[in-house]
């Protein structure tokens, strides 16, 4: 999975099938490929903590709970699996936790989270 962001409008696009693309554009400019963990945010508040219990997957953002305030919060948590992906949107005031259920024969691959100030983070 690859995430791209528009520098102007801040829109995020998710590429899920891995097909090569010459250039994704938004607002008349090329979109930037986001790389997990490339900002200066504290890893303990951003790297997803993942618990897999049978078909249930719980993703908590950070080993130290991430703030969920209007000015600083987790916008979404995405789960990559062997059969695709699932995504949950979060709002300020909510707990930085997302729960997912895997389908039969589906396995966890990675969890991603996006912080509005510190960008994309990943746990495999």
Residue ranges and their predicted role:
Residues 114-123:
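Short acidic/polar inter-strand loop motif in beta-rich domains
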Residues 20-30:
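Cysteine-rich micro-motifs
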């Amino acid at each position: 999975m690859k995430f791209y962001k528009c520098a102007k409008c801040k829109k995020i696009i998710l590429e899920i099938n891995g097909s090569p693309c010459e250039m994704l554009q938004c607002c008349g400019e090329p979109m930037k490929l986001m790389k997990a963990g490339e900002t200066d945010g504290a890893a303990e508040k951003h790297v997803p903590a993942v618990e897999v219990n049978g078909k249930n997957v719980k993703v908590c953002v950070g080993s130290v709970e991430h703030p969920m305030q209007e000015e600083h919060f987790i916008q979404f948590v995405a789960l990559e699996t062997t059969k695709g992906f699932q995504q949950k949107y979060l709002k300020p005031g909510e707990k930085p936790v997302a729960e997912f259920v895997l389908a039969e024969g589906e396995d966890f691959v990675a969890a991603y989270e996006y912080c509005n100030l510190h960008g994309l983070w990943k746990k495999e």
